Amino acid sequence: WFHLGRLLTSVEGMPTLLSWSATLFEYLMPLLLMKRFPDTLLDQSCRMALRRQIAYGRERRVPWGISEAAFNVVDRLDNYQYKAFGVPGLGLKRGLADDLVVAPYATALAAMLDPTEAARNLRRLAGAGLEGAYGFYESIDFTHAEATEVLGEARNADPSHGTVVRAFLAHHQG
C-alpha cells in the first residue's frame, strides 16, 4: 500500500487517496483485514472518505453510505442488478453523480471509524423502512426520486424517500 503510485484529491483541505469508484467499501474493507496505522495517508484517506460520504448524504438530503450494491433495476428473471456506486470527487470513475444508492452495510463498515455517526445513520435507515426479517435490506435507491416527484407518483413524492431494494445479499449481512 505504501509504495503504490496513487492520485490524490482534497477533502476538507486534507490529502485523500482517490479510489476507482469511490465506494465506502473500497476505503474501509481493508480495515477488516489489515492493521491500521494512525496518522498515515491511508488512515487519513479512510477518515476523509467517510467524512465526504456523510457530507454528500447531507447535501443530497439522504442517509449516507454509498457503495457497491443491488439497485432498483431487475432483469427479465426479476433479479436485482448490482454495481458500484460512489461519491463524486472521491473516484476516478465517470458518472458517479448519475446514481444515488445507499447501502446499510457501508454504514456498518463505518462503525469502525465513527460508531456514533454510524449508529445515527443506521437508525435513520431503519426509520426509512430498511429493516427486514434478516437484518437490513440491501439498499435504498434514490436515483429516480426527483424524476418521480416531477411525474407526480406518490411513493416518491418526498425526495428524501427512495425505493427500498428488498433483498438480502449474504456478503453484505456481516
Over which residues does each language-model region extend?
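Ser/Thr/Asn(+Pro)-rich, low-complexity disordered segments
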Residues: W1-G174
